[in-house]
């Protein structure tokens, strides 16, 4: 196969590398720089990409495009797009709900999509690689932030196609950086590595375990709109405010012109402050031929960006929480991205991990391209290196995947941050009699109720046994390495089956929706817990009532129960079921009160039945007959025994059966007897012990006296 390259398509800078001769080479561009600005400029005569485009931005700001990565895969109405437009010197228009960049090129007004701008940067990276390798480059692995959604990933892949590249895979930037860190690490045992990737426009945190070439992502978090550009903008706003104080009569047009000329100077000042305590900014002829000159200290810069710096710790906390790993268990913190050179960022990370110093062994600007080059070699079939042959990448599902069960409850089968590929099965049953089929609805999200989550797809399984609780329906979720999910359902008795395939681009969430879901999950956590605690007693009462009703239909019960008792219990069950139908939104306390009322009628009748000495008929607790009193397998549950509850759960598709109060009360009644029996057995053993060890000794002593 032809050589494949790894490309880090960054917000502000891009980088390309290749793995060959058992080593990685980061390829310098025609200016001798190992990173290339992600800038594209349009003039009256030509199109410029990279360093040439950035160098003329002050003279041609309206036609020099940058930060396309902040627009790619987004809608024009996106609040972040709207906020960015205030800082962009070039014009963005709405075309079909998508942002389009408008420039003047060769005397004409042209429109370009973010994908097209990104493809131009990718073309530059491809040409850089071809000039170095002396041949054609067709295959590439392109990186994206871990928190990019499917729309953004697909748009990035489209940019690669426009650039004439066969994109072998889109991989996450922190995962690529982890490869760069771990490729030559041969430490024994499993190591927990946290990748802190703060670049020009995006921020990712990923926690991985690395062991013998296996790179397993445990959890990931981040912000696709936080990076060095935001720090630059704080400096720009600061200097513009200062400029306005000095020149109070400045017009909006002149202010806009000042804004266009200051970003490059502010970026330069920011870089200087990483190694110096103070720097100055000088812009020639900024206003009416007057030069603008001022200085800024590192302390002032840190104060301007303090809230942004501190916000980087929130994803770190979330990653550790999701992975259920204490910060003391993190072996290495790897800093990636140019913005991690800021001393305040390094100090915050170190302080968070109780003084542990971050690992700075890899170049933060090149680490992502380095790892992408390794992955490109693996995917292109390069088997010449032992180090690449031993690498295995395992990524994660960004959101929980599950089905809807009784009461509109979200029942996850695959939790968020589960390693993919993965396969998970659970067994469910039907919730009511004469149910000819079940509707299996697949959802994605973190909320307790399915109405608050995203529906991915649904299908029906028909031709199943009609008796409530009898069918055993095995639902299986199977997610492969490409994120394609197969959901199947099998009724074990009839062997009836059905399935659905859900792909990455079918009904998936946007980045905004993912962020909203996660934010809402935190915000409404208490509300979700309250709702779940309300539904539990509701379903417990419903299951209890229906199980009692089914038990009354059993012939043995019908024979042994007195007609008056049977009618009384039946009437109370009907009353409870009717109340449930009319009070679907009742409180937890009301459901518990109804359960107590039903128990007050049912328990004495149950006790009288047991006192008859007949034992439990089929379907009673511990028996295996059909129908059955609550708790028995005959009620549609697999025998799990005791108070642990059933193993096959009831659903509408399903809701878990709870241990039943009348069962518990019977057991509690016999507890003193069991305790007495245990004491009696202990006493007998004690007497035997004394007889065996002490009486023979006394007998022998009497013989010798």
UniProtKB/Swiss-Prot annotation:
Pfam families in alphabetical order: HSP70
GO cellular component term of the entry, any: cytoplasm
Keyword Kinase: no
Family annotation (InterPro entries): ATPase_NBD (IPR043129), Heat_shock_70_CS (IPR018181), HSP70_C_sf (IPR029048), HSP70_peptide-bd_sf (IPR029047), Hsp_70_fam (IPR013126)
Biased composition (Gly residues): 624-644
Alphabetized PROSITE patterns for the sequence: HSP70_1 (PS00297), HSP70_2 (PS00329), HSP70_3 (PS01036)
Highest taxon of the lineage: Eukaryota
Residue segments, region Disordered: 624-645
GO MF annotation list: ATP binding; ATP-dependent protein folding chaperone
Keywords carried by this UniProt record: ATP-binding, Chaperone, Nucleotide-binding, Stress response
UniProt family annotation: Belongs to the heat shock protein 70 family.
Protein name (database record): Heat shock 70 kDa protein
Classification of source organism: Eukaryota, Fungi, Dikarya, Ascomycota, Pezizomycotina
């Amino acid at each position: 196969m032809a050589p494949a390259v790894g490309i880090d398509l960054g917000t502000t800078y891009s980088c390309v590398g290749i793995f060959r001769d058992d080593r990685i080479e980061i390829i310098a561009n025609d200016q001798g720089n190992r990173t290339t600005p992600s800038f594209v400029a349009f003039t009256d005569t030509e199109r410029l990409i990279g360093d040439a485009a950035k160098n003329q931005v002050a003279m041609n700001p309206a036609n020099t495009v940058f930060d396309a990565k902040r627009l790619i895969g987004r809608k024009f109405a996106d609040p972040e797009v709207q906020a960015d437009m205030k800082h962009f010197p070039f014009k963005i228009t709405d075309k079909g709900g998508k942002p389009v960049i408008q420039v003047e090129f060769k005397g004409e007004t042209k429109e370009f999509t973010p994908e097209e701008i990104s493809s131009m940067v990718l073309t530059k990276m491809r040409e850089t690689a071809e000039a170095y390798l002396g041949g054609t480059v067709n295959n590439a692995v392109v990186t994206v932030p871990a928190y990019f959604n499917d729309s953004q990933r697909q748009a990035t892949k489209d940019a690669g196609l426009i650039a004439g590249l066969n994109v072998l895979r889109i991989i996450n930037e922190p995962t690529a950086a982890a490869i760069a860190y771990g490729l030559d690490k041969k430490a024994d045992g499993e190591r927990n590595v946290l990748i802190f990737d703060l670049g020009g426009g995006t921020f990712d945190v990923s926690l991985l375990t690395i062991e013998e070439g296996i790179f397993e992502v445990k959890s990931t978090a981040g912000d696709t709109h936080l990076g060095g550009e935001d720090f630059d903008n704080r400096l720009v706003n600061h200097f513009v405010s200062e400029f306005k104080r000095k020149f109070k009569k400045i017009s909006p047009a002149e202010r806009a012109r000042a804004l266009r000329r200051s970003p490059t100077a502010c970026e330069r000042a920011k870089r200087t402050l990483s190694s110096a305590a103070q720097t100055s900014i000088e812009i020639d002829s900024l206003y009416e031929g007057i030069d603008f000159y001022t200085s800024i200290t590192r302390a002032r810069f840190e104060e301007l960006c303090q809230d942004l710096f501190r916000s980087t710790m929130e994803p770190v906390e979330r990653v550790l929480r999701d992975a259920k790993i204490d910060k003391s268990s993190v072996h290495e913190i790897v800093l990636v991205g140019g913005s991690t050179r800021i001393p305040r960022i390094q100090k915050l990370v170190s302080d968070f991990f109780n003084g542990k110093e971050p690992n700075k062994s890899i170049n933060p600007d090149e680490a992502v391209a380095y790892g992408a080059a390794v992955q490109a070699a693996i995917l292109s079939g390069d088997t010449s290196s032992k180090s690449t042959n031993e690498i295995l990448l395992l990524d994660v599902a960004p959101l929980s995947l599950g089905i809807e069960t009784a009461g509109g409850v979200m029942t996850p089968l695959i939790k968020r941050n589960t390693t993919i590929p993965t396969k998970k099965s659970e067994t469910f049953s039907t919730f009511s009699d004469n149910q000819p089929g079940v509707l299996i609805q697949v959802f994605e999200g973190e909320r307790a109720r399915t109405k608050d989550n995203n529906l991915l797809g649904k299908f029906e399984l028909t031709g199943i046994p009609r008796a409530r609780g009898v069918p055993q329906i095995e639902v299986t979720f199977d997610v492969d390495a490409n994120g394609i999910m197969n959901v199947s359902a099998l009724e074990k008795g009839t062997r009836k089956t059905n399935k659905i395939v859900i792909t990455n681009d079918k009904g998936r969430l946007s980045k905004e929706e993912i962020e909203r879901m996660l934010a809402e999950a935190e915000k409404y956590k208490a509300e979700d817990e309250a709702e779940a605690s309300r539904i539990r007693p509701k379903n417990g009462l419903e299951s209890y009532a229906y199980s009692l009703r089914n038990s009354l239909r059993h012939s043995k019960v019908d024979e042994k129960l007195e007609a008056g008792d049977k009618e009384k219990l039946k009437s109370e069950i009907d009353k409870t079921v009717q109340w449930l139908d009319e009070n679907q939104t009742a409180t937890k306390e009301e459901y518990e009160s109804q359960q107590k009322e039903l128990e007050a009628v049912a328990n004495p009748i149950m006790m009288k039945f047991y006192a008859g000495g007949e034992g439990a008929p089929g379907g009673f607790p511990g028996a295996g007959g059909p129908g059955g009193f609550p708790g028995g397998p005959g009620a549609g549950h697999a025998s799990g025994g005791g108070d642990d509850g059933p193993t096959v759960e009831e659903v509408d598709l399903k809701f878990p059966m709870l241990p039943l109060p009348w069962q518990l009360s019977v057991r509690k009644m016999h507890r003193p007897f069991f305790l007495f029996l245990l004491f009696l057995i202990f006493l007998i053993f004690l007497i035997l012990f004394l007889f065996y060890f002490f009486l023979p000794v006394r007998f022998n002593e009497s013989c010798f006296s």
